[in-house]
C-alpha cells in the first residue's frame, strides 16, 4: 500500500498604511487626497515599500451665485464637475521571482520537477493609473407632471494605463519552459 503525504506552506507577509483627508466647503465643492503605502515579502528582499497616491475634487456649479441667479437655474437644478486620479498596485504572488520545485509521485517514489511556468527575478509591482473627469446634471422637467418631474445625467471620461503588467507569456518549446512571467 502506497501512502502519499503532502504539505504546502507559503510564507507571505504584507502590510500597509493608508492616509486620506477630505475637505468640503459647504455644498459648493470639495477635495480629498491620500496615499497608500504597501510592503510585501513578494516584492523581494532589496525592494522598498510601494506608495500609491489618490485624489479627487468636485465643484457644484449650480450652487454658485452667478448660476443661481441665471434663467437656466430653473431648468438645470444641479450641475457638478468632478475629477479624480488614483494609482493602485498588484503585487507578484509569493515565489513568482524565485526558482521553485514542485513535488510529484512517480510509481512508489517521490519526484521533484521544475514547474511549467518559469519564475522571473525581475518582476516589479504592477501599477495601474487612472484619471477620471466627469459631470452630473439634474434637469427639472416641470412640476405639473405626475411622474418624470426630473432627469439626471452623468457623464465620465476615464483613461487607465498599466505599467509592469504581470502575465504569463508563452515561451519557445525548445526552451523547455511552458510560460514565463
Predicted regions located by residue number:
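Extracellular/periplasmic, surface-exposed regions of secreted and cell-surface proteins
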Residues: 1-181
Amino acid at each position: 500500500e502506497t501512502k502519499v503525504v503532502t504539505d504546502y506552506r507559503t510564507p507571505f507577509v504584507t502590510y500597509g498604511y493608508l492616509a486620506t483627508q477630505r475637505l468640503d466647503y459647504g455644498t459648493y465643492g470639495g477635495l480629498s487626497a491620500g496615499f497608500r503605502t504597501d510592503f510585501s515579502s513578494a516584492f523581494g528582499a532589496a525592494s522598498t515599500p510601494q506608495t500609491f497616491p489618490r485624489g479627487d475634487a468636485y465643484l457644484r456649479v449650480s450652487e454658485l451665485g452667478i448660476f443661481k441667479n441665471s434663467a437656466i437655474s430653473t431648468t438645470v437644478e444641479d450641475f457638478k464637475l468632478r475629477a479624480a486620479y488614483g494609482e493602485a498596485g498588484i503585487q507578484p504572488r509569493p515565489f513568482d521571482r524565485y526558482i521553485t520545485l514542485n513535488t510529484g509521485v512517480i510509481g512508489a517514489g517521490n519526484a521533484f520537477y521544475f514547474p511549467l511556468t518559469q519564475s522571473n527575478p525581475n518582476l516589479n509591482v504592477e501599477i495601474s493609473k487612472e484619471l477620471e473627469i466627469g459631470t452630473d446634471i439634474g434637469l427639472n422637467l416641470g412640476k405639473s407632471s405626475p411622474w418624470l418631474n426630473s432627469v439626471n445625467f452623468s457623464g465620465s471620461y476615464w483613461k487607465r494605463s498599466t505599467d509592469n503588467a504581470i502575465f504569463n507569456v508563452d515561451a519557445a518549446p525548445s526552451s523547455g519552459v511552458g510560460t514565463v512571467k
